[in-house]
Amino acid sequence: MRRSFLISAALGLSMSTPALAASIQSVLGYLRPTSHHHAPCADDVVLKQSAGSDSAAPDPLPSRVVHNWPNGTWIENISVRPNGNLLVSQSTPRGRVWQVKEPWLDEPKVELAYDFDEWVDRIIGIGETTPDKYVVVGSRFYSLDPQSSQVERTFCAMELDFTKGEKPSARLVARFPHANLLQSVSALPWDRSVVLISDQYLLHPRADWEDLTPGPGQIWRLDTKTGHHEIVMTNYAEMNTTYNHGLDVGINGIKIHGDHLYWINMDTGGAYRVRIDKYGYPTPLNAVPETLGVAEDALWDDFAMHGTRIGEESDDTTMFATSIVNLMAISPENGTIVPLAGVGTSEPMGFPGPTSAQFGRTEKDSHILYVTGKLFNVPPSIRDVVIQGWVRAIDTTGFHF
């Protein structure tokens, strides 16, 4: 993949972080790590021939648009309720969670579930804990502008509770003053009141590119009943920021499947896992993570897996991962990585800025992968980024490696 393509792809906010400036700067740093102030040039422009249609490329999986939000709305993460409704987190212009009801319908009803402005300005990750309760993470930001940065020491975890009716309640679970950039949330299958949360390293200040020592990514453990939280994993090379793809990247989406924690690293392009004990710690404590697959040009965001939803058992551990302008499947068994939508298929420009994915939970849509995104289209240049949130339904019927 051409580096000129990577730079514009990153305009899709390659990380799960809601900071457009950081995203652009990250890939600019990857392309030109010695340049502090570089104006966009012709090579920065992604022309359609850079990712033009390849007659030899596979067709994308069938898909349809479930819902589009207005321009300026950034949809970041997704969880699926037991009744099949989708909950999606909004990062801009406000920290909200939306509900998409009966997403298998042609025109599903979309309504605001909760506005978290009491505690945060933007929401990033959302994950189900006990049935129909969800932990969401976010922070204050300096402005509503998508290019704004988060205010340090303001990250927190909140709970969204649908167990008492269709009008949910919310509460603050815990503040994380020492977190860098909370990202993805995944509950322990055997104790769903406890979640693990990925925390992406952040270089401070962003303008200082002198010290490029790999920065540590980390995993927090949060007890949602007590609010107690602690770091349970850090300083794994497989979680770290290495500056291979720029600044402010590293570990991103996480999922727990069986007795393993799975994650993807936007910086290394790798997918990894490590065995965990009943408390969420790696076992043994000096365990070496297993590399499942690497796509060096992939800028991973989040992913879905079979068998990670409440009440389900499955040996299928295929990872369906979002990466800037495409959706890919990763086989943990042999490391095979194949494109399913967007770049790498016969319609490379058709999947702009995907952010996260989850499978449906009803008989109607258990084969459907719901994918969220935040770009109107794949921009022709860095001057033409249009943020627009969306949800699409990908039909995975018959997919196999």
Swiss-Prot record:
Explain the induction of this protein: Expression is significantly up-regulated under xenovulene A producing condition.
**What pathway, per the record?**
Secondary metabolite biosynthesis; terpenoid biosynthesis
GO BP terms: namely: terpenoid biosynthetic process
Is tRNA processing set as a keyword in this record?
no
Key words, A-Z: Glycoprotein, Isomerase, Signal
Q: How is it used?
A: Xenovulene A is a natural product exhibiting little structural resemblance with classical benzodiazepines yet is able to displace high-affinity ligand binding to the benzodiazepine site of the gamma-aminobutyrate A (GABAA) receptor and could be potentially used as an anti-depressant with reduced addictive properties.
Q: Could you say which residues form the signal peptide?
A: 1-21
Return the EC number: 5.5.-.-
Record: glycosylation sites: N71, N77, N240, N334
The GO terms describing molecular function are: isomerase activity
- Which sequence ranges are marked TM in the entry? none
Task performed by this protein:
Putative hetero-Diels-Alderase; part of the gene cluster that mediates the biosynthesis of xenovulene A, an unusual meroterpenoid that has potent inhibitory effects on the human gamma-aminobutyrate A (GABAA) benzodiazepine receptor. The first step of xenovulene A biosynthesis is the biosynthesis of 3-methylorcinaldehyde performed by the non-reducing polyketide synthase aspks1. The salicylate hydroxylase asL1 then catalyzes the oxidative dearomatization of 3-methylorcinaldehyde to yield a dearomatized hydroxycyclohexadione.
**Similarity-based family:** Belongs to the eupF Diels-Alderase family.
Q: What is this protein called?
A: Putative hetero-Diels-Alderase asR5
